[in-house]
Amino acid sequence: MRPLFQLGPRLALCAGFVREGTVLCDVGTDHAYLPIWLLKTGKISRALACDIRPGPLETARKDGAKYEAGEGLSFRLSDGLRQVSPEEAKDVVIAGMGGELILRIVEETPWLRDPGKRLVLQPMSSVPELRLGLAEAGFQVLE
């Protein structure tokens, strides 16, 4: 078995906010490092890795196989959460995108308002605009 990698600071911070035992959806997964790491460390048992582009999704699949993530990791070609149903995720991570794009994804996904859902958002830009948009939409911003 290949040794498990260490998450960089940005993804490690996101991992800390994911609830133990949850079902995760990682939007814009790219390499799927976050769901692979969470699965391999036993923090979660299932994850859905989503990306809008086929290339990064194929890279994620290869990484899942390389690190033996197992059947707990599935993959989906999706623009944001458009191809994800509410029962497929309890915690949703959207990291590494601009704040405006994150806000668009959140606003167009009504089921994220369910109080049982947790959003872990890590914007690369437009942080004040994202915070304001989330507050105006009725979301509670914790950190």
Tell where the protein language model's regions lie, with residue ranges.
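S-adenosyl-L-methionine
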Residues: 1-22, 36, 58-87
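Class I S-adenosyl-L-methionine
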Residues: 2-7, 11, 83, 88, ...
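Conserved class I S-adenosyl-L-methionine
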Residues: 21-30
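Conserved SAM-binding loop of SAM-dependent methyltransferases across substrates and taxa
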Residues: 31-44
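Conserved SAM-binding motif I beta-strand of class I
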Residues: 46-51
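Conserved SAM/SAH-binding beta-strand->alpha-helix loop
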Residues: 53-55
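Short SAM/SAH-binding signature in class I
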Residues: 89-96
